[in-house]
A protein has these predicted regions:
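Core catalytic architecture of nucleotide-activated donor-dependent transferases building glycoconjugates
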Residues: 1-53, 57
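Short loop/helix-cap segments at secondary-structure boundaries that form the rim of catalytic
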Residues: 31-38, 86, 113-118
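A short helix-to-beta-strand connector/capping loop
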Residues: 38-41, 100, 124-128
Length: 141
């Protein structure tokens, strides 16, 4: 199990086990092979990109799907951040959430050590749950 797996496994534990989990990823085949993503609880966004023309990625489909979810576990990516931000599960002012179990779990720190000089205090909204993500895994671009 790698560090990245630990982040997602711990984040999953913050959601009720009787709730479905929609897995959205640009490496969906890898996700389907993970032991910790097995069972009827997990639904995979498996739109075949080949159906949409040249086989190129069509992330807007995954973004739309994420906005329909009632919470989420996000990666340190702008796509997953916007997918969580645009959900209607919680109000944007940080008051009580509309859905009983609505929450977003976000990795903290967002970037690896290379980017420590940047002020990231406003990146993750106060109503989201920050979960430690070992920065040694986060690869610099």
């Amino acid at each position: 199990m790698c560090i990245r797996d630990r982040y997602y496994i711990e984040a999953l534990s913050k959601f009720p086990e009787d709730k479905n989990v929609v897995v959205v990823s640009d490496t969906i085949d890898w996700c389907k092979k993970q032991d910790w993503l097995q069972g009827d609880r997990f639904l995979f966004s498996d739109a075949s990109y080949e159906e949409f023309g040249d086989g190129a990625s069509v992330p807007y489909i995954d973004l739309c799907l994420m906005t329909l979810c009632g919470g989420g576990i996000i990666a340190n990516s702008s796509l997953s951040w916007w997918g969580a931000w645009l959900q209607k599960g919680g109000d944007k002012m940080g008051k009580n959430s509309i859905q009983r179990h609505w929450q977003v779990v976000a990795p903290d720190p967002w970037f690896g050590i290379k980017y420590d000089m940047y002020d990231m205090k406003d990146l993750i909204p106060a109503r989201w749950v920050k979960l430690y993500n070992d920065p040694s895994y986060i690869e610099p671009e």
